[in-house]
Amino acid sequence: MRSPERVLNSLSEHSKDASYKFERLYRILFNEEMFYVAYQRIYAKEGNMTKGSDGQTIDNMSLKRIDKLIDTLKDETYQPQPSKRVYIPKKNGKKRPLGVPTFNDKLIQEVVRMVLEAIYEGSFEYTSHGFRPNRSCHTALTHIQKEFSGAKWFVEGDIKGFFDNINHDVLINILMERIADERFIRLVRKFLKAGYIEEWQFHNTYSGTPQGGIISPILANIYLDKLDKYIKEYTTKFDKGKKRKFSRESMDFGNARKRIVRRLKSVKDERQRTKLILELKAIEQGRAKYPNGEEMDADYRRMKYARYADDFIVGVIGSKQDAKQIKEDIKNFLADKLALELSDEKTLVTHTERVAKFLGYEITVRKSNDQRRDKRGRLRRTYGKRVCLNVSTETVRKKLFDWGVLELTNRNGKEIWKPKCKSGLIFNDDLEILDSYNREIVGFYNYYSIANNCAHALNNFSYIMEYSMYKTFAGKYKCRTRKINKKYRKNGKFIVKHMTKAGVKERYFYDGGFKRKKPTYKSECDTMPRTIYTAGRTSLIERLKARECELCGATDDLVMHHVRKLKNLQGKESWERHMIARKRKTIAVCRSCHKKIHDGKID
């Protein structure tokens, strides 16, 4: 049986031929090694300990469980279970439905996802950034900052309920353009039609992909790749002219400069030469205040585009009418070809000197007459028409408010921010309180670290988080914040001491500052890179194959016991001490020991 690496690399190589049709894909799902890789890739996710609609979790995983799954795939008796529907809050206060598949379904979906990624990833457009290897929100924003310079208009795209409205027939037809395997297509359709359970009631799914399903992101990208390719073709037709005409001012200053340079070549008198040089400098200073090209050149148009999942934005160098026409054409394409609806109310045509919103950032094109000299010593404007990415005060305020660390008061009609005790943490130990604040600070900073106004915008954020932490410690110990600072502050740093096996260690409150980071395509990505996990001696599958219980040493078929978090273990039982010592959330045990663990009867 071929290794997963060879299987996926072969698919990837064949995908380079756009006319190639993939057959016999379904047979890949009979390869147990593919399931071993899938298990290794998804086992650590906390959601795997959440029960699906079948009442099971990742716990009790075994090689036999995989073999049984493969048998049901071989005879096509496998039927995905309906996902359990839960709701998570959205930024606008509404709630987004999320499906929780059973773990068996997650495992098969991960294998299918790997196959689909190997086939389609190489053909996706560079303008697509969501849920792709080595891509992220940051790569999308960096793309905009590099490509959208000089744009006059933004078209902010909003597709109504995209994930809930993906047309199953359209999606299947798109898949069949490259995949000629009826059994594989039937399996994908089974996932789409699996339905969901909400409040003990089963609901059919007639459209959409289940948000929360492992294959949903790749299916969404395959679907919207049609939009990406349409935009690519549209851009080729829309773009016009090689470069902008020189502006009237630029030509006038250029001609004046040429005249003075000619005179300088013939004038020998030093006083006259000094006078001409001063005139030349004045011309260069005046020229730097104006754009080189004609901003409203009717013979020059450009269109730029970026997409992250179902959010997209278009930058237009052209007229407002051009931008409106682009919006209308995209709307018609989505309706006619993809059975999707573009929201007229939320799909805005915005002048680039105003704010467009994308992925939590505010985007503008900044116009400035600030000057500095380039490498050749010529005066240039610092910002001609460059894209600025900003984090808004409202974004910072809302996040602090959501975390429960901000109290708003009003003084003389002005909103005042005051730090607030995070009462939900006062019963936690000191290290947990410190780590909670550090995680939130670093997470927020990492996401907004490429904002042009990062350092300035996060000043208040830093103050509120720091003093909220002081108030939380003060609430825990029923004292004033001054006493907390006296107890924990050392050499200007807030320190929590904690005991480890190596002795007493110190953990610091974050004080790394909020300097803007240079955007890079190596930013933290949304998905794991497309590499195959090479199982080592201590991998999950090798431990199951060893057939030696890690608790009692008995030789037998093993199951993997999983826990949600290591920190929840108290270390009172031998199996807990075993997991804590090895810093693992898993332990391979015989069925007898596994039953004793759950019954609380382990020695």
Q: PLM ranges: what are they?
A:
Residues M1-D603:
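Non-catalytic terminal/accessory segments
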